[in-house]
Amino acid sequence: MASLIYRQLLTNSYTVELSDEINTIGSEKSQNITINPGPFAQTNYAPVTWSHGEVNDSTTIEPVLDGPYQPTSFKPPSDYWILLNPTNQQVVLEGTNKTDIWIALLLVEPNVTNQSRQYTLFGETKQITIENNTNKWKFFEMFRSNVSSEFQHKRTLTSDTKLAGFLKHYNSVWTFHGETPHATTDYSSTSNLSEVETTIHVEFYIISRSQESKCVEYINTGLPPMQNTRNIVPVALSSRSVTYQRAQVSEDIIISKTSLWKEMQYNRDIIIRFKFNNSIIKLGGLGYKWSEISFKAANYQYNYLRDGEQVTAHTTCSVNGVNNFSYNGGLLPTHFSISRYEVIKENSYVYVDYWDDSQAFRNMVYVRSLAANLNSVKCSGGNYNFQMPVGAWPVMSGGAVSLHFAGVTLSTQFTDFVSLNSLRFRFSLTVEEPPFSILRTRVSGLYGLPASNPNSGHEYYEIAGRFSLISLVPSNDDYQTPIMNSITVRQDLERQLGDLREEFNSLSQEIAITQLIDLALLPLDMFSMFSGIKSTIDAAKSMATKVMKKFKRSGLATSISELTGSLSNAASSVSRSSSIRSNISSISEWTDVSEQIAGSSDSVRNISTQTSAISRRLRLREITTQTEGMNDIDISAAVLKTKIDRSTHIRPDTLPDIITESSEKFIPKRAYRVLKDDEVMEADVDGKFFAYKVDTFEEVPFDVDKFVDLVTDSPVISAIIDFKTLKNLNDNYGITRSQALDLIRSDPRVLRDFINQNNPIIKNRIEQLILQCRL
């Protein structure tokens, strides 16, 4: 049968190569990580003992003359003079906003007669007439107001210092004209000053407009003497008076830099959104008692705008120092009680781990000078109804706390796909009005926030603030430290798996039922399963090894392993006796279920509960019991094989995940039956049960004890054609006893005959099973 593929996986009959282990370690997320508090985040402090580079003193000084800088293209800031210092370049500067202004500065050497020269301006070749009959240098300012016009000679600067200037201010572009040492400024108006970009072909300096007198002095008399030692720039005493500038929303400042590493200070305005999560567990019994109401860590991903930039952020919220409360309304089974419910108060802390996709979190490995300032937020509790079978429901309501920023450290958030270097913000709590109470009980007037409904209908709570840190990062911005590279492998794999899942699910409707049943009868093993994948025939053994390793950690394999272990222990502990039945191990497997049934009432509720508990384990019997009929495992393997053959996204690294996921998720709504003489007993995973006669399909009372005995002694049959379908088929078409038995046993030949006859009832049932084979 097709289920040979799953049986073969469960036998673990393939070796594991060291190279496969190494690849797995590099591509899979970490396992068995204990994190406290909260299952997603842990705190660690960064080392701060590395050697510093160049360190500025505490006085911020804006130099008069900043530079020199290499030729470049950029959008210069407003209110800063660009002091141009050419050597012998013919084109000094090009500037335009591509709407109403095009400016070019040309340099002409002394003693040049009237002549036409060729220049390349803004990518266009132009012939321009120039003349310089003086012994000084001349800067020709060429201007046009639209892209189709020709350049006109607008201004001339005659200079013996060979310096020119360019400034963006108010709604104009400013330059120098006249003759040194009496050159002055002039302007050209524009309606779009902010978009003016420049291409500078010479070395240049930057001077604040507040020091414009110095710029005029340099243009007319030349630059001051320069010393070629590091960090020494002649500045005027007046430059120590710094014009106040408002801090930017996002700031990346280089503190120090060497050849390989640099210290970057990141200042960020952030918006933190978080929510609480909780776990509410109800005790068994009559439905009047609750076991636990507790806080759980909660992940939240969101987007927001920061200085016009879209930011993607991720937070994890967890709590520490909770207070355990309880309520006991009485000793009777119908008395309301809560064994434990958690409340956060003044002695508690709330941790919010924050990460966003900005540069600040890209290389957060070595960090110092970490500081933050955040607002406070009030969190109020909502109502939670304790739904009891009879009587008025108790309601837990109210409660509130305020969160106040109390510190920040480094942390790591762990999600299903990636680990994130984060900042952990710690908040202390103060209790607020109103207190919380439990309506219809004696509990009232207690302060704090209970875990029953901590979000009170809010999608999230929001805190605004700002953080600053200095991080040691590679000097090359294109390089990422290995801690982030190691986790992107899993992200890429998940992206591939996502595409594969979408493709698999879309293929379900394209599979022919007759082809599926024919395929389900073939002995599909590991190697035939891979035959549809290109370029993997030679690597079949390696492929099987990878699939085997992944499958060993699946829930199905774990259940089989636990079943085998429990049966072995039971068999070894039973003394040999003639009274012991040959299937003692099977009896032990069902003993706990039988004991539960023995102590239960005959109500429909309890029978449903017990059959549901049994049916969860019937799948193991489906694997371990070989029958001649078709089962759900056969259909799962056949659908999987068909989809693998048709898929365009299958790759060797995605196949193990797909096969493992299919074993867990294909056909989740399964039904099983056992056959004894003329009676059939059937149960599904939802706890629904039927007992009926083969001849008439008349329902008879369902005996749970008899069902357990039959499961122990007889093969478990997959209900490919379930009771409702059989009854519908008999009522509309009428079927013989022989056909009924064949359909009950899931005989594939009879199924094929009904489908070939285009029977809509049988065909629809098989199509429903195929559509359940989704990832």
UniProtKB/Swiss-Prot annotation:
Domain of life, per lineage: Viruses
InterPro entries, alphabetized: ConA-like_dom_sf, Rota_A_VP4, Rota_VP4_MID, Rota_VP4_MID_sf, VP4_concanavalin-like, VP4_helical
Gene Ontology annotations of biological process type: permeabilization of host organelle membrane involved in viral entry into host cell; virion attachment to host cell
Position of sequence motif DGE motif: 307-309
Ranges spanned by the short sequence motif KID motif, renumbered to the chain: 643-645
One GO cellular component term: host cell rough endoplasmic reticulum
Chain positions covered by the region annotation Spike head: 65-223
Region (Hydrophobic): 388-408
Disulfide cysteine pairs (residue numbers): C317-C379
Region (Spike body and stalk (antigen domain)): 247-478
Region of interest called Spike foot, as start-end residue ranges on this chain: 509-775
Site (Cleavage): R230, N231, R240, S241, R246, A247
Similarity remark: Belongs to the rotavirus VP4 family.
Note: This strain probably does not use sialic acid to attach to the host cell. In group A rotaviruses, VP4 defines the P serotype.
Protein name per its UniProtKB record: Outer capsid protein VP4
